Amino acid sequence: MNNNEYSIRNIDGKYYLYCGDAQVLTPEEAPICTTSEELAKLLLRDAEEYGVDTENVLSTLSYHSLYCDLLHQEEDEEGENIEMFNNLIHIDYFWAFYEPRTIRAAALSQYLDVLPKHVNDLPLHQNAAYVNLMAATGSIILPHKLVCMLLSETSRFSIENYDELVLALESYGQASGAAEDIDVDWTFDSIKKMVKTFITYYMLESL
């Protein structure tokens, strides 16, 4: 298994999150989640501790069935899709607490301040400041994660957004040294596949 690949393993009736062959959550670090509801409670607990809007994670989890439908929708059906993607983006705030390759705890407050500003308010090519923050703290954000965050700023999967997405990812690659990881096929079907992969990292049920 690739060292950057995540999987959820059922061991003796309990779910464990793995990054490659390494266990990410251990019983000593956090409660073991046996259901998606327990996962939600775990995320909400830390959301409250760090002052993050808990409605975001609730919306994300409640949209689970709609995400499944989204994977089969076409490009021109943009209204609800964007609302769903915006809710999907928020889950990344909470994942920073568990993902060992993302921002370290010492920079959490700065991360929570900078992420919304650079993902939602600035043109995609100006995400370099956000990328530089990630690189400066020794963190790595996987390309497909960044894609999903950037999609919150795009109104639809269209050719107008294509160049900006690639440019932002190139900036990410240069800053993090992960340029070799971003050579992917930027078609609508390919992006949908990445989104499906992204979702499975946060949901215990298989899509």
Please identify what each model-predicted range represents.
Residues N2-Q23, E29-P31, T35-L207:
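Non-transmembrane, aqueous-exposed alpha-helical and coiled segments at domain scale
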